Amino acid sequence: MSRLDQINGPADIRRIPAAEWGALASEIRRFLISHCAECGGHLASNLGVVELTMAMYLSFCPPTDKIIWDVGHQSYTHKILSGRKKDFAGLRSFGGIAGFPKRNESPCDAFNTGHSSTSISAGLGMATARDLRGEQHAVISVIGDGALTGGMAYEALNNAGRMKSNFIIVLNDNRMSISENVGGMSAYLNSIRTSAGYNRLKENVAEALSAIPGLGKRMVESLRTTKNGIKQLFVPGMLFENLGVTYLGPVDGHDIKKLMRVFEEARRLNRAVLVHVITEKGKGYRPAERHPDLFHGVGPFELATGVPKKNKHYPDYTDIFSKTLIQLAAEDSRIVAVTAAMPEGTGLAAFGRRYPQRYFDVGIAEQHAVTSAAGLAAGGMKPVVAVYSSFLQRGFDQVLHDVCIQNLPVVFAIDRAGLVGADGETHQGVFDLSYLGCIPNMTILAPKNCWELEEELRFAFSYGGPIAIRYPRGQAYRGLGEHREPIRFGKAELLFREEKTALLALGSMVSTAEHVREKLKALGQPCTLVNMRFAKPIDRELLAELAETHQNFVTLEENVLRGGFGLEVAEWASSKEKELSVTHIALPDAYVEHGDVSVLRQHLGIDSDSIVRVLRDKYHW
C-alpha cells in the first residue's frame, strides 16, 4: 500500500514516519499532476503548497483546529489529507466534490471560499467566536501574496493587531496570484525575501552578547528595550509589526520540519501572528514551474509535455474582445484599459504589451479598479474595465457611487457572464444583469455572436456614459451570419418574423433560441425571434409593434430571473391594455453549483430541448 493510500482522514498523516514525509509529498504531486492532466483543474497553485499543507496537518488537528484557505483553489492537498482522495474522480464535476472548500462537503472545510482576500476577516471572526465561547482550538488563515494585494486583507490586518489571543495568518508567498503580482506590496515582500538573514542575525547577536562575562546579559536587555528602533532597521516584516501583528519568517515552504517548528512557535503567542512562507508555484512539474500562469487553471493536457489536449479552432469571446480593443485603441489614443490582476483571463495582456502606458493592472482590487477608471474618465480618457462577472460584484458601490452618479463614460467588459461551469457558485456570472440593471444611468448590452461583440465595443466607446457589455466564457458563436450593422441605442434586432409567439433572447441565449425556433417550426409552431441586444433599456418600440400581432412573449436570459431583463419585459406587458402572456426562461433564485456547462443547462432547464418542453406544456402545442 502506498503512503497516500494510507490517508483516509485528517489524523492519518501523523502516523506516517517523518522519514517518509518527502516521499508522501512526491506521491501527492504525482496524483495531482495525473488527475489534472486527465480532468483539468487548478494545478500550479496546488503543487506549490503540498509541504505547507502537510506541515499544517502535522502541527494542527483539523477539523477541531480551523484552517481557512483564501480563494481556496489551492486546497486540493487539504482535501486529500482530510480523506477525500477517493472522490477526486468527480472533482469539479456535477454532483462531485468542489474545487474550493465547502462547509457542507467536509467538517475540515472551515469556511467557504472562492473569491480573494477574505480569509483574514473570516479567521478573525472565527477566532473571536472561539474566545467568546471559551474554546481553545487554533484558527489559521492561509492567504497568498496575490490575495494580499486586495484591500479587504488590510482592513482585516488592521483589526487583527488588536487580538489578545492566538490567531495565525500564513502568508503563502509564491510571487504570483494568477499572473505576476503588481504594486507596492509585491515589492515589499520581495525585499523581505532578500533580507531573510535577519532572524539568523538576531539570534547570532543575542548569543554572542550573552557570552560576554558580566556585561552580556545586561547588553541584551538594553537592546530589548530599544528593539523597536532596531527592528525599524532590520526587521523585514515591520509593516505587519506596526499593525500589531507579530511577524515570523520568511520560512522555506517546502521544508516540513522548519514549518512545524515555526507553527509551534506561532501557536504559543497570545496575539495575531503572521508566518511568512516562501513557496514555488508549480513545484514538481517542469512545465508548470516554467509557466505557472498557464497552469493556474487548466483543461486536460498531455502529461509528458503539458500541451492542452484540446486545441482552440475558433476564437473565444475573450479573444474577440482583445483583438477589437487593440484595433479601437489604434484609432483613439484616449482608450485605456484596467484589469484587477486578470490580464490573461480578460484578454488584456496583449493590449498591455501593445500599449503599456495605457494599460493598468491594479492587483486584486476591484473597488480600486472601478474608481480609478472613473478618475480616468473624469480626466478625459476612455477607460474599459475588463473583469469577470462574479468579480465585478466586489466593486458594486464604486460602479453606483463613483461611475454612474457622475454619468462617467466607463466601459465595463464583463467576461464570464452566465454559467462558467466547474468553478461553481462563487464564479457563475449569473447576477450582473440584476445588480447592474437597478443602477440609474447604466446601459447594458450582450452580443449574440462574435461579430456583434465587435460592433458593441465600438458603440460603447462612442456612447459617452456608463455602459456594460456582458459576454460568456468559451468559443464565440459564429451563427446567424456575419451581417453587421451599427448598434443603435436601445434598439433590438428582429431576426425572424412570424406571428403569435415571439422569442426575446439576450446574448448567449440567442443561439439557444434559434435552436428552439427551428424545433418549434418543425412542430408546426413558427415563432418570431428577436435578438434583444440591450438588457437596459429594452426596445419598447419594437415590443409595442410585435404586441399588435403576437399574444405570447418568451424571454430567454442566462441570468437569475430576479432583476433580469425578463421582468422588465413583464412590467412592460402589464402596462398594456391587451392581455399578453409572458413566459420567462432564466435561472432560479438559487446558487448554481459546479459542473460542465452543458450539464448545468439541462439541469436548470435552459437548454433548447427543455425550453421546447416548457412551451409545449404551457401553450398546449
Task: Enumerate the language-model features and the residues they cover.
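N-terminal amphipathic, basic-rich helices that act as targeting or association modules
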Residues: 1-81, 245-260, 269, 273-279
